[in-house]
Regions:
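Alpha-helical bundle regulatory/interaction domains
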Residues: 1-192, 202-207, 221-241, 257-285
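DNA major-groove recognition helix of helix-turn-helix
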Residues: 199, 211, 250, 262
Length: 285
């Protein structure tokens, strides 16, 4: 029986900071589970394992993840394996969303499983609320209710402020990653060094890294089209010098070939790279 994945989009008061809350579960325990390749998408996530913990390949060994942690924004893929009994909840934040909601800087958190105690006491409280819920659906509702109450208690207008990097992020998405850092700084009205510090603080990535990830997102969306285009045409349209340039960048970010199929990334990973989600990411919705 396949994993059951459920996604609940963030309501309007949270939408500036949070994309969604999600759950993945399985009604029957399974011993032999395939690996998943989780690709960079620019979004850090709160992960709470209510059942057995996922494992992640680290230095060629499978290491069990903490029961609750922040999955720092990825600049390279994570290879993970579901446990026998799956019951996991995620809160997927937008770029800059954690800093906007909780004031926690993300500098130095990229590609890490970050202890919640290193970030923000409210994140610990949110994880506890998720753990206490009776089932996946209750956990998603409880997480959303807690986040709405947190915003109402800390913001007079009941809405999350836009992240400081929001203008630059929108410019990158609007161009689908076809923009240089100097042009991005000009679009954001910031000196380059200040923009780089802001990006590190709010996304854990440099502007250049984030640009590459958005360009990857655009590529994944095009490569998954029913009628596949010639790779050279895709490469040139995406702003690469040639197909070889695209292939090198794609391999560096995904550790797989551009010609591989999305379904090969794993039964959890395919939900994160659905065409509709990639399109929403590119549009900033």
């Amino acid at each position: 029986m396949p994993l059951r994945y459920v996604e609940r989009p963030a309501p309007a008061p949270l939408a500036a900071a949070i994309e969604c809350v999600w759950s993945v579960s399985d009604r029957e325990a399974r011993r032999a589970r395939p690996l998943d390749r989780l690709l960079p998408d620019g979004c850090p996530e709160l992960i709470v394992h209510r059942g057995d913990r996922y494992g992640r390949i680290v230095d060629r060994r499978l290491v069990r993840q903490p029961a609750a942690f922040l999955a720092g924004t990825l600049s390279r893929p994570w290879i993970v394996q579901a446990p026998p009994r799956v019951a996991t909840i995620g809160v997927r934040f937008r770029p800059g969303g954690i800093t906007a909601l909780f004031g926690a800087p993300l500098t130095g958190t990229a590609d890490r499983e970050v202890p919640l105690a290193d970030l923000s006491a409210p994140l610990i409280a949110l994880a506890a609320v998720i753990r206490r819920a009776r089932g996946p659906a209750s956990a998603l509702r409880a997480a959303e209710a807690w986040l709405l109450a947190h915003v109402a208690a800390h913001r007079p207008d009941g809405r999350v402020p836009a992240p400081g990097c929001a203008v630059a992020v929108r410019a990158i998405h609007r161009r689908r990653g076809r923009i240089g850092v100097e042009a991005l700084a000009a679009a954001a009205g910031l000196p380059r060094r200040r923009l780089e510090r802001l990006f590190r603080r709010e996304t854990a990535l440099s502007p250049k890294q984030y640009i590459r990830i958005v360009r990857l997102t655009a590529l994944l969306h095009r490569l998954d089209a029913p009628e596949r285009e010639r790779l050279i045409d895709v490469a040139l349209d995406a702003g690469y010098f040639d197909q070889a340039h695209m292939a090198r960048d794609f391999k560096a970010l995904t550790e797989r070939r551009a010609s591989a199929r999305r379904g090969d990334d794993g039964e959890l990973a395919v939900h994160f790279t659905r065409p509709d989600r990639l399109l929403r990411l590119l549009s900033g919705a």
